[in-house]
Amino acid sequence: MANYTGANVITAGDVTKYQPDAFGFGIASTDTEAVNFFAQTTNDILRQLRVEWWQTYKTNIFTDITILNTAEMVDTKVNLDQFERAGVYLFLGRFLCPALTKFRPETEKDRFERMGEFYMSEYNKEWRTILEDGVEYDETGDGTIQVSEREPLHGFRRLTR
């Protein structure tokens, strides 16, 4: 089932599939801090989509050039299920691990700094792969993704040289 609900990209269960002990270091999955991290992960993914992908999509899809500057991405039309792995990596790398680290510049990096760097690297790879494969955006709002509604970053309809 595709996630068009506007709910968060990931849940605590998704995180523990990739890092089973993630919530065993002092921040529980139900803590306000973790709940805020889940919401911020979703917001960051949607913002990055608007910045990196939406311009290509609307240029390739909308034929009426008068609406190109006014067309906004509708968050609930993005299938967030395709961002689960990227969301977990972003949650761990940008939010959870930095919240747990000691950040002592005079010493070696601690476990959480190294984990944060690893997960951000994995996030960047996963993000690129999703954009190259094609973002699922339900333009018609019918709850299904047609071939024409899956737009890669480079665009199918663009001449590439």
Please place each PLM-identified region on the residue numbering:
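Elongated alpha-helical scaffolds
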Residues: 81-95
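Short loop/turn elements at secondary-structure junctions
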Residues: 4-6, 27-28, 93-161
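Short acidic, glycine/proline-enriched loop segments that cap or flank alpha-helices
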Residues: 75-83, 102-103, 107
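Conserved short "hinge" loops at termini or chain/domain junctions
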Residues: 1-80, 138-161
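Short, low-complexity intrinsically disordered segments
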Residues: 51-52, 81, 101, 125
